[in-house]
Curated annotation (Swiss-Prot):
UniProt-annotated binding residues for Zn(2+): 279, 343
Annotated family: Belongs to the ThiC family.
Source organism of this protein record: Trichormus variabilis (strain ATCC 29413 / PCC 7937) (Anabaena variabilis)
Pathway where this protein functions: Cofactor biosynthesis; thiamine diphosphate biosynthesis
Catalyzed reaction equations: 5-amino-1-(5-phospho-beta-D-ribosyl)imidazole + S-adenosyl-L-methionine = 4-amino-2-methyl-5-(phosphooxymethyl)pyrimidine + CO + 5'-deoxyadenosine + formate + L-methionine + 3 H(+)
PANTHER family xrefs: PHOSPHOMETHYLPYRIMIDINE SYNTHASE, CHLOROPLASTIC, THIAMINE BIOSYNTHESIS PROTEIN THIC
Cofactor: how and how many bound: Binds 1 [4Fe-4S] cluster per subunit. The cluster is coordinated with 3 cysteines and an exchangeable S-adenosyl-L-methionine.
UniProt-annotated binding residues for substrate: 80, 109, 139, 175, 195-197, 236-239, 275, 302
Keyword tags: 4Fe-4S, Iron, Iron-sulfur, Lyase, Metal-binding, S-adenosyl-L-methionine, Thiamine biosynthesis, Zinc
Protein name as catalogued: Phosphomethylpyrimidine synthase
GO biological processes: thiamine biosynthetic process; thiamine diphosphate biosynthetic process
Family matches, as Gene3D superfamilies: 6.10.250.620, Radical SAM ThiC family, central domain (3.20.20.540)
Enzyme Commission number(s) of this protein: 4.1.99.17
Pfam family, one: ThiC_Rad_SAM
Length: 457
């Protein structure tokens, strides 16, 4: 799709969407996004130029269908997939990708740490994906030194980061915000450091007594990203891993650094979004979103959850969707889904489905609350179909049509019930939606009430 679009850009020193936007150019990607979002193309360009919106679109991911992440666009959902040393393989991950796209994932992150050749898995996912692909290069950097964190060098990190960029990765989580001086701040936490990438870098700094190499070499990463139009997803290494640890000094110290790094990337026209927590009580979610906007100059916020309670293993797609809906309402640009397997194991296909649907609900609810143009149109259409007992239309408009039909057909499977004016909940005699009040009846009632009012006066 994008082959012709990017052909003329190849060989230029800076090919980022932000670079073109700041030159006043509306790229084909911006035009495409404008149509998808039903927004003016020049507004898209302005938002990208300001850094309030990103269009993650590596020039080597030519089958990508461009999309936007930002406060002016619809709230987006990311799905995580990825093989581990103990579970899954290349084909399973491609299948998960296809399932995630089917159920509405706006972006997909490949978090593979094993299960085969990581380069082959990543390439297969990118080649099959119409949505932006994100990665965490620290994982493969660690694999390249056979799991011995102390042996990692800055060059190891940069080599893997460039490899991912060359392969067509659209955004990379870069854990550059965790600094050596932040580490003592985790003493009072219950769960310490829960970011895998953050944990790797923390151990490296503790061993070498040196500053985070991703921080000291941030300019080198910028130069790589400029050449391929890779977006930063600045990782929150010190995100809280439980509600007790939310909004603490460690989290906020890193957030301040992430804001500084955001502005440094913007100096070179490189796109940025900022990752956020995590586990956050409901009363702290608004603070967290507004604090990020303040510290990071309104760069798009991308949050994991957040989970609003810690006591529901097996149901964390629910505990987190509650927080995600609130975060989206307050202005978060993208929600990273959580599956029922969170904290318990690697998600399978059904877990991916359940997590995604929970988060599509959260994002859609946020769009309605934020009064996005047309956000409620689908709800209204489904409500009309429900009132008219148009069962097939209800299924069609559902976020998960297969599940809706499956539940309906558990008790009333015959085709005749697809036109019935009841379901198995109320049966044929007690459904309140059978009470159809026509306009003539209401007019007569209004006349009667008016006369009654005159008599009372």
């Amino acid at each position: 799709m994008r082959t012709e679009w990017v052909a003329k850009r190849r060989g230029q020193g800076n090919v980022t969407q932000m670079h073109y936007a700041r030159q006043g150019v509306i790229t084909e990607e911006m035009q495409y996004v404008a149509q998808r979002e039903n927004l003016p193309a020049d507004l898209i360009r302005e938002e990208v130029a300001r850094g309030r919106m990103i269009i993650p679109a590596n020039i080597n991911h030519t089958n990508l269908e461009p999309m936007a992440i930002g406060i002016a666009s619809k709230c987006k959902v990311n799905a995580n997939i990825g093989a581990s040393p103990n579970s899954s393989n290349l084909q399973e991950e491609v299948d998960k990708l296809n399932l995630a796209v089917k159920y509405g994932a706006d972006t997909v992150m490949d978090l593979s740490t094993g299960g085969g050749n990581l380069d082959e898995i990543r390439t297969a996912i990118i080649n099959a994906s119409p949505v932006p692909i994100g990665t965490v290069p620290v994982y493969q950097a660690l694999e390249s030194v056979h799991g011995t964190i102390e042996n990692l060098t800055p060059e190891d990190f940069l080599h893997i980061i460039e490899k991912h960029a060359q392969q067509g990765v659209d955004y990379q989580t870069i854990h550059a915000g965790i600094l050596i001086e932040h580490l003592p701040l985790v003493r009072s936490r219950i769960t310490g450091i829960v970011s895998r990438g953050g944990g790797i870098l923390a151990r490296w700094m503790l061993h070498h007594h040196k500053q985070n190499p991703l921080y000291t070499h941030f300019r080198d990463i910028i130069e790589i990203f400029k050449r391929y139009d890779v977006s930063f997803s600045l990782g929150d290494s010190l995100r809280p891993g439980c509600t007790h640890d939310a909004s603490d000094d460690a989290q906020l110290a890193e957030l301040k650094t992430l804001g500084q790094l955001t502005r440094k990337a913007w100096e070179h026209d490189v796109q940025v979004m900022v990752e956020g927590p995590g586990h956050v009580p409901m009363d702290q979610i608004e603070f967290n979103v507004k604090k990020q906007m303040e510290e990071c100059s309104e760069a798009p916020f991308y949050v994991l959850g957040p989970l609003v309670t810690d006591i529901a293993p097996g149901y964390d797609h629910i505990t987190s969707a509650i927080g995600a809906a609130m975060a989206g309402w307050y202005g978060t640009a993208m929600l990273c889904y959580v599956t029922p397997k969170e904290h318990l194991g690697l998600p399978n296909a059904e877990d991916v489905r359940n997590g995604l649907i929970a988060y599509k609900i959260a994002a859609h609810a946020a769009d309605i609350a934020r009064h996005r143009p047309g956000a409620r149109d689908r709800d209204d259409e489904l409500s009309k179909a429900r009132y008219n007992f148009d069962w097939n239309r209800q299924f069609e408009l559902s976020l998960d049509p297969e599940r809706a039909k499956e539940y309906h057909d558990e008790t009333l499977p015959a085709d005749i019930y697809k036109t019935a004016e009841f379901c198995s909940m109320c049966g044929p005699k007690f459904c309140p939606m059978q009470t159809k009040v026509d306009a003539d009846a209401l007019t007569e009632l209004e006349k009667f009430l008016a006369k009654e009012k005159e008599v009372m006066i």
